[in-house]
Amino acid sequence: MDSRGRPKSYGGDFIRTKLFSKSPVQASTAGRVTDYGNGTYVARFFLSFPGRLHVAVKLVHSSEAVQVLKRLQEGSLARRVMVCGFQEETDPNPEWMQCSNTPNKSLNLRDVCDFSNPLINVSFYCQRPESSRCVSFVGCHRDHAATLAMHDKMATEEEKKLFTRDRDLHEELPRDISVQVKGKRRVWKVHGKALPLCGPRLPETASEGYWFNGAWTSLRCQARRFRTVESVVECLHNKTVFFRGDSTTRQWFRYLMILLKLQQHGRGAQPVFGIDEKNKIKFHFLFHKFPRNQGPVMDGNDMGYVAEEIDGISGGKDVVIIITLWAHFMAEPIQTFRSRLYGIRHAIERLHSRHPDTKVIWRTPNTGHHHQFQHYVENSDWYAYQLLHIVKEILGDLNISIINVWEMSESMWHDDDMHPPNDVIENHIDLLLSHICPL
């Protein structure tokens, strides 16, 4: 139905579907939706477990809302305001100027501080301060008030109504559709054939996998369980693991640090690391550089552009690089993300030309929780889903592992959360270690 209750004759809605059972086991899997463009949608599920299964459908965004999001994403400006400080040693206070990953075309080039690095496909510009030099750059933060004012002008009042909680089906409906599935649950096999070992360039499948009593079963590769400290240590023995990206990468870093009871060196937004001297395991996390969506001032020296970081890493068979780039890019023009990915792609190719046995692992986006217009404008799941496909398009043919956690997130038993709870992260780590240490 459209906004007036009439049957739709066009597609474009952003829909999620799930097949699940609650008894005697708790199991679930995400469906894949085909949009026929005429108001008709078909959800397909890979039947992986037997029982009385129920179907749930969730309208995340109507097609009208998607058009608004698409218009904003394809624009030339970010959907947040970032200001950066410039301060000479003799000045008591910094000058705060607007900065962005895209140039402000209304400014003369003489009025711009250009911090771009074309060698790694990075662009970053600031309005030149009146009394400070460009080299006096001290840090940046999100201007929340200016960002909200910008959001208010980005859509009409009618368009904003498309994102109210009573417009979309935030509850999964209907709950009275069920099917009886018979047969036996198979592990590591699909249609009688063994799944490949976890690693790069895995073939596409009808489903990423399914939840079964709290454990994720992959249908893409032979993922194992690493539920003891001993099994994790055995996998990571003598390895140096670099975590590069956003807070969802840091969540993996922290999980492993706590699991192995390692002391964290460094704090806050600074680079942090942990070392297990006995087992020769090293973890190192560094947040990616701009764009960043953060209120407190961020020191640029505490961050690094991922491509630049890759160029500075000495690879080898005992080196693992884990990358996640999405949460802070959803509010950027789509070309900013594409450009950044190409820079990272070239850096990975340079790394593998030096050390072809270096493992590179990319973690995809997952779903998040939104309930205000500003959240949708900056961080809608529709944006995250587009970034997922761009990652596969630009990086999919490289010798890297892409761990797709989207369907894990869609079908989990928890509410949507950019930072899923620990029992979900535990299953993420199983996948990660299965790619580092395949059978």
Indicate where each model-derived feature is located.
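A compositional signature for long Ser/Thr(±Pro)-rich, low-complexity
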Residues: 1-439
